[in-house]
Swiss-Prot record:
Compositionally skewed regions (Low complexity) per UniProt: 17-28, 630-639
UniProt entry tagged with the keyword Coiled coil: yes
Name the UniProt record assigns to this protein: Kinesin-like protein KIN-7A
Disordered: region residues: 1-29, 624-689, 741-762
Homology family: Belongs to the TRAFAC class myosin-kinesin ATPase superfamily. Kinesin family. KIN-7 subfamily.
Chain's role: May be essential to promote the progression of cytokinesis during node-internode differentiation.
Tissue: Ubiquitous with a preferential expression in the shoot apical meristem (SAM).
Compositional bias per record (Basic and acidic residues), positions renumbered to this chain: 640-660, 666-681
SMART domains referenced in this protein's UniProt entry, alphabetically: KISc
Coiled-coil features, chain-numbered ranges: 363-436, 480-588
Matching InterPro entries: Kinesin-like_fam, Kinesin_motor_dom, Kinesin_motor_dom_sf, NACK_C, P-loop_NTPase
Cellular component, GO annotation: microtubule
Amino acid sequence: MGVSRPPSTPASKIERTPMSTPTPGGSTRVKEEKIFVTVRVRPLSKKELALKDQVAWECDDNQTILYKGPPQDRAAPTSYTFDKVFGPASQTEVVYEEGAKDVAMSALTGINATIFAYGQTSSGKTFTMRGVTESAVNDIYRHIENTPERDFIIKISAMEIYNEIVKDLLRPESTNLRLLDDPEKGTIVEKLEEEIAKDSQHLRHLISICEEQRQVGETALNDTSSRSHQIIRLTVESRLREVSGCVKSFVANLNFVDLAGSERAAQTHAVGARLKEGCHINRSLLTLTTVIRKLSSDKRSGHIPYRDSKLTRILQLSLGGNARTAIICTMSPAQTHVEQSRNTLFFATCAKEVTNNAKVNMVVSDKQLVKHLQMEVARLEAELRTPDRASSSEIIIMERDRKIRQMEKEMEELKKQRDNAQLKLEELQKKMGDNQPGWNPFDSPQRTRKCLTYSGSLQPSNKMKIRSSIRQSATAPFMLKHEIRKLEQLQQQLEVEANRAIEVLHKEVECHKHGNQDAAETIAKLQAEIRGMQSVRSDRDVDMITDEGNGSDLKEEISRLHMQDNDIAKLEAKLENVQRSIDRLVMSLPNVGTQCNETTPKSNRAKKKKRMLLPLGVSNINRPNLIRAPCSPLSSSRPLEPEVENRAPEGDTVSHEGSERATPTKSEDTGDVSSRDETPRYRRSSSVNMKKMQKMFQNAAEENVRNIRAYVTELKERVAKLQYQKQLLVCQVLELESNEGKTNDMEEDSEENAGSLQDGPDSWDRLFKEQMQHIIQLWDLCHVSIIHRTQFYLLFRGDRADQIYIEVEVRRLTWLQQHFAEVGDASPAAGDDSTISLASSIKALRNEREFLARRMGSRLTEEERERLFIKWQVPLEAKQRKLQLVNRLWTDPNDQAHIDESADIVARLVGFCEGGNISKEMFELNFAVPASRKPWLMGWQPISNMIREKTQLW
C-alpha cells in the first residue's frame, strides 16, 4: 500500500514556531477558547420500541435539553445547557455544519483540531462520526480547489486502541506499537504508517480500509458494537506556490476520534472476551473523564493523569493544549438508559469548561531560515555603519523643541516672580513715605523683624540702616512666600491626618452603635471644628488670591500668617484630644485592656469564637491600627488607605445588626471588665444547642414521614394480598363442594351463585370476551410475565365457573396499573422484594424472554425453529434470531391470531402441553420462572402456595 511521496521538507529540518511566535502582521496568534460541546439525541431504537420504552429526554431549544421522565430517587438537575443540542429529527449534515465544521476547517490554516464522539454504547457515535468525517473531507478538498495560490499535502494515519494495545489500521499485520515522548511533537506512536492521499477518492478509500480493520463485536444492546477507540489523523501541510524571501508553510493535525461506548455488564450480558473488552473501555473512559474534570476546575495546578491511559496520552494536546476541540456527545432518550445519559451529560458539562490554547503552527526550512537571517544581519550592519541621517536629525530636533518649551515655561515663571517682586517693592516704597503716628517700629525689635512697613518719622541716626533694609527688602517677598507655603503644607497635612483619624474613629463607632457616647460626641465636635477651620481657610485662600491679584501689601500677609499659626496651634490641641479619644475608645473595645492579658484556653476559645462572629470592621485584625496615633509625626509618611479598605463598609451595618443576637456587643458589655466576666457563658452554647435540637427534630420528623409512607404502602399491599387469598379460598371451597356434593344446601347455594353469575349463554360469552380482551390489554401495559399470560389464556377458555378467576385477574391488574402510576419508575430498595415498579417489571419480562430463547434449542427441533423464523419474519442473516423471535411474542394485544400463536409457542417452550389436566386455582405452581420472587410478576403462584400451606395447617 506504499505511495510515492512528493519532495517535502523532512521532519528533522522543520522548526516549529513556539507559543509566542509573531505572525507576519506582528501579533502573536495564540488563541484561548473553550471546547465546543454539542449533544445529539438519537431516536428510539427498534428494540426500545418493541419493549415500549418511554422517552425521558426532550430538546427544549437548540441549546437546552430537559428531563421529562418520572422523578428520580436522588436529586439531579432536570435541564442542561450546551453550545448546541440536536434532537432526534436532526440530520448528520446539520450536526457537522453547526457543531464541527468550524473546528475541522481550522486545520487548513495551521491550527490543530480534534473532533470527539462520546457516549454510551448503541447511542450513535460511529454513525455520527462517519457522516462528520465524510463532510469534512468534502469541505477540505473544496477549499483546496478554491485556494490555487497554495500547495496542499494531505497525509493520513489511523490507529485503534484495543484492550490498551495500539494497532495500526493501515497495516493489519502490525503488533503492539509503543508510545514515545518527543520534546517538540509530544507523544508519538512508533512505526505508525502514514500515507499521502492523492485525491479525495483515494482518501475515502483509505478511511474505509481503517473502518474495516476496526474491532467490532455483538452485544445485547448493539449487534455491531465498536470494541476499540479509533483515531483517524489527517496531517495537512500547505505552502505558497510563489517563492518569497522566507517561505513559510502551515502544518496541522486533524483528529477524528470515535470512542468506544461505555457499557454495563448487567445490560450487555457480556462474558469472556466481551467482558474483558468492556473493562478496558470503561477504564480508559474513566481516565478521560478524570482528565476533563480536572481541566475544567479552577485549580489546574494539580496533577492531571494523562499517562494513566494510552487514549489520553495520545490526545494530550487536544485536551487543554495546542488544539481546537469539538466534542459531540450522543445519547439515547429511553427511560431505561437514564443513568447512562446523565453520566454523558455530566461529562459534557465538564468538557465545556476546558480551555485550550490553540496557535498557528508555522514551519520554516533550515536553509531558507538561514538565508533570511543572513539578510537581516547584513541589513542591521549596514544601518550601524551608515546611520539614517534623516531619522537622527528628527530626533535631535524633537529633543531641542522639548527643551525650548521647558525653558520658555521657566522664563514665564521667573517673569511672574519678578513682576510680583517689583510690585511689592513699589508698594513698600510708597507706604514708607506715609505718616503713621502712634507707632514706632524701634520700640519692639521682634516686631520690627516680622513687620516690613515703617513710618515716616525716623531718627537721623537710623536712616542709613533703613536704606540698607530697603535694599534688602527686594528678596523678602520670595522668602516670605516660601515660608508661608511651608506652613500651609504643614497645616494641610495635619488636617488630612486629623480627618483620617476622625474617619477611622467614626467608622469604629458606627460598628459599635451602642458604644461610648462621650467618645462619639467628642468626635462629632472635632469634625465640626475641622470643617469650620477648612471653610475659613478656603475663604482665606480665596481672599489671598484676590488680594494678590489686586496687589495686597505684606502686612496683610504677615497678619494672615499669624492667624494661621494660631489655627495650627488650635489644630494641634484638637488632635491631642483626638489621640486621647482614640485611646479611650480602644480601651473600651472588647478583648482590649485587662482581657488582652488573659491566657487561659477558655478565654482564647471565646476570643476566637467572637472574632469569627464579628464582621471585619470590628475584628481584632484592625485594632492595632487604631492604637497607633494617626496624628504623630511618624504617621505622616505611613499611608492609611489600606487600613480604611480593610474595614467593613457602611452598608455592612445591617449584617452586623443581624449578628448582634449571636455576638455580644459593646452595649451588652457596658461597665467594667468584671461585669463582662460575670456574664453567663451558657447563652451562646444554649443557642447552639437549640439549633442542634431543631435540626434533630427536623430530621426525626422527616424520617417519621418516610417510615409512615413506607408502612402505609406495605399495608396496602398486604390488604390486596389478603383480598386475593380470600377470593381464591372461596373458589376452592365452591369447586370442592360442587364436586363432592356433601349437602343439598351448599349445592343450592352454589347453584344460586352460578345462576346469579349468568343471564344467558350469549351474554356470558360476550362478557367473557370483553373481560379477556381487557385483561390482555392490561397485561401489555403492565408488562406481565408472558408465561403467566399463556397459562391463564389456555386454562380459562370461557367456562361459566371461570368468572371468579377472571374477576380476580381484572382486579389484580387494575391495582397493579394504579400502583405503577403512583410509584412511577422508582427502583425498589435493596432487599425489598415486596416493592415493585415498572422498571422491575420490564426487567423481569426481559429476563423471562431470554430464558425462553435459551429453551428453544432444547424444546424445539431445528426444522420447527426454521419454520417459526420464516413465519415470524426473522431474517436469516440476523443476529440472535431466537431472542428476536421471542421478543415478537405477545406484542400485539389487538390481534387474536397473534395471541393464539404466541400462547402456543410459549406453551411448547415451557411444557404446558405435557402436564395434562391442571387444577385452575393451582395453575402456576409448576411452570414459574425460578429466578423471580416478586408476587405480582409471578401471577398467582405465591398466593396459591400460601393457600396450600394454610390449608395443610388447618
